[in-house]
């Protein structure tokens, strides 16, 4: 009589175990976690996500500080001067360390070899397969950009082309006040500050953005209603 009881219990056990299995991969992650790490593109996008959201303060601080110093240097000096100073600084460090290790080895009469041997032996060659993969990924974005440019300049959609014209008109005023390097500095400050501020005050920001979106949508609809070509297309 023990066998039937075991048989009756086994389906419930198997069903409970089978019900527990799907919950493991589908379990919701933390709110700030980056989704889907299945592919290389997802992992790279998640790395950028973690970088601009200051998940690793040391790593983000290093990237932010280095790029900011580079941009400030380019604002004060020419590109040739900045690149030359960077190469000189790097060579000063490596040559000094090479001489220092050679002197230490001569004094101690040791044969540790080249101090950078581990890095010299690293294989940094780019395979043809990897090159083609990068080129294919780049071509997707290039083709998409070309299609968008053709659409805008050949006025496939009048509203989109007018938006571009207004944006470019505003950029003429921005260009009169700021140069390219200044805009890059401002862009970097925004990239490394806006996401973390948005994450902290998401509810309030979404509320005001929704109001602004509704106002913009109503204005665009009024403009479209006054344009005969677009009104006719909508009626059709």
Swiss-Prot record:
Transmembrane segments: none annotated. Keywords: Acetylation, Apoptosis, Endoplasmic reticulum, ER-Golgi transport, Golgi apparatus, Membrane, Phosphoprotein, Transmembrane, Transmembrane helix, Transport. GO terms for cellular component: endoplasmic reticulum; endoplasmic reticulum membrane; Golgi apparatus; Golgi membrane; neuron projection; postsynaptic density. It comes from Pongo abelii (Sumatran orangutan). Residues 2-67, 92-151, 173-176, 198-236 are cytoplasmic. It is a multi-pass membrane protein. Residues 204-206 are annotated as: Interaction with BACE1. Homodimer. Interacts with RTN4. Interacts with BACE1, BACE2, BCL2 and FADD. Interacts with ATL1 and ATL2. Interacts with TMEM33. Interacts with ZFYVE27 and with KIF5A in a ZFYVE27-dependent manner. Interacts with RIGI. Interacts with TRIM25. Residues 1-31 are annotated as: Disordered. Residues 68-91, 152-172, 177-197 dip into the membrane without crossing it. GO terms for biological process: apoptotic process; brain development; endoplasmic reticulum tubular network formation; negative regulation of amyloid-beta formation; neuron differentiation; vesicle-mediated transport. InterPro entries: Reticulon, RTN1-4. It is found in: Endoplasmic reticulum membrane; Golgi apparatus membrane. The modification N-acetylalanine is found at residue 2. Residues 1-24 have a biased composition (Low complexity). The keyword Zinc-finger does not apply. Residues 191-236 are annotated as: Interaction with FADD. This is Reticulon-3. It comes from the Eukaryota. The modification Phosphoserine is found at residue 30. Its main location: endoplasmic reticulum. Residues 48-236 form the Reticulon domain. May be involved in membrane trafficking in the early secretory pathway. Inhibits BACE1 activity and amyloid precursor protein processing. May induce caspase-8 cascade and apoptosis. May favor BCL2 translocation to the mitochondria upon endoplasmic reticulum stress. Induces the formation of endoplasmic reticulum tubules. Acts also as an inflammation-resolving regulator by interacting with both TRIM25 and RIGI, subsequently impairing RIGI 'Lys-63'-linked polyubiquitination leading to IRF3 and NF-kappa-B inhibition.
